[in-house]
Amino acid sequence: PIRRIWEDGIFQVGSQFSHTWKFSDINYQVASLEDKKVMFLDYSELLNSLDAGSIAKITVNNRTLNRANFEQSVLMPMRGDARDKYRKEYNGVILGKATAGNGIVQEKYLTVTVPKKNIEEARAYFTRVGAGLAVHFAALGSKCVELDATERLRILHDFYRQGEEVDFHFDARDMMRKGHDFRDYICPDYIERHSDYLILGGKYCRTLYLKDYANYIRDSFVCELTGLNRNMMLSIDIIPIPMDEAVREVENRLLGVETNITNWQRRQNANNNFSAVIPYDMEQQRKESKEFLDDLTTRDQRMMQGVLTMVLCAGSKEQLDADTDQILSLSRQKMCQMAVLKYQQTDGLNTVLPIGTRKINAFRTLTTESLAVFMPFKVQEIQDKGGIYFGENAISHNLILCNRENLLNQSSFILGVPGSGKSFSAKELIAFLILNTEDDILICDPEGEFAPMVQAMGSDIGTVVHVAAGGRDRLNAMYMVEGYGENNPIVVKSQFIMSLVERIDPKGVGAKQKSIIDRCTGDLYEEAEQNSTVPTLAALREKLMEQPEAEARE
């Protein structure tokens, strides 16, 4: 259905133009009830902001974690030194944890389709829409970024050619120079159509849609549908209705219900039945119509038409049937009915994919609140490139890989009850930094529990210093690093030495004694600079003993 593409990510679909934004997940499922209410209202505001002249599509894409890309971005590279054995062991632990998890990466997109006369008008419209979406997603705590043509085509390529993700390559200029079609880069080798499933290059796919809605749907419905550990894609098509048209439609329906009730009462009166009670179904229609009109006119709700579709992918027909039964069973548990599209699998697939088309017309009229129940947010994933392993996500069971270099403040505390693993976490972090970075690491270890780890890493990069009374290591109070004291380091060091002597001598240091210490300190550093040596407190004592004043030897 895609006719033309532009490098900035705009697709021409039929006579319309579409653009896609990718938004990050937020911690909705693990939030408190109060926080969920705030997020729900913010998401409702986002839905209300959708333009009535456009069609929006919210897509949740479950794709298998690409092992090659994962290893390249997460695992430690070997460096050919004695510590490679520890790197191999660390990589083995990470791969084991990744295999034990669900191995599914969930991505979320918002696609907007709008009819415009030309690409210039469409580009201006999408620029305005993108700015508004960024504000609303920021209020939710989510990040929204627009996708260019390469990124949008990569989504389609990874879906059509599962298992060949690393082979994707698209260069628009090279394509035009060679006269190739962009479809050649993403389409499967063949498509085999059946009444209730498709075969895309050896992979079995089946498209379903939400046929019947429950009276009450929990906000975890979409998350539970997409929680299956399989490649799948779920989309919610949203068609906002203009407010004046929506109010007029509901008023006409309410007028029709009132007319039916009046006609029924007239017939009862003609039969001399003046005490007849209005039938329950008519009373319910009147009540629901009034509530709907109330939502539109007093509660800032909007009328929207929505359709939920999803496509399942599997390696075999048997696995596809089993996954389909699981989805159908899950929807029945929620008092909803998912159904398989018959002889509409291709139309359903084009509806699910985030390209901006809609071929399935199984609409349900909803208010903003009713549509917001299909909450796409689940839990935030932290998988930074080059990140440190901090554990597993309690909801998705995926790895938590955080690169603190990306944070505004890289400082951290390790807090926990006794026995919860604080020391182990610190050792794990230090070991990662030693093995994978060139960082300088200083460890203050009063308990002496980190020394074996430093010694195991090798004496060429680590040293254990024992600072204690009677110990073999000393701290040189006279040592100065480059840049010490800024303008006059000797004066600053002299003041430090005098304060040190004052702490040692309980009687205090007089003015003449301070003058002697100041003079000796300057002379000592001058001699050390000439001899290329480092002064010590012992050298300062010898210098003081050489002075003619009696106070110098006190």
Regions found by a protein language model. Name each.
Residues N62-R63, A149-I155, K342-V352, A451-M453, ...:
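A glycine-rich phosphate-binding loop feature that marks nucleotide/adenosyl-phosphate handling sites
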Residues T365-A394:
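Pre-P-loop entry segment of helicase/translocase ATPase cores
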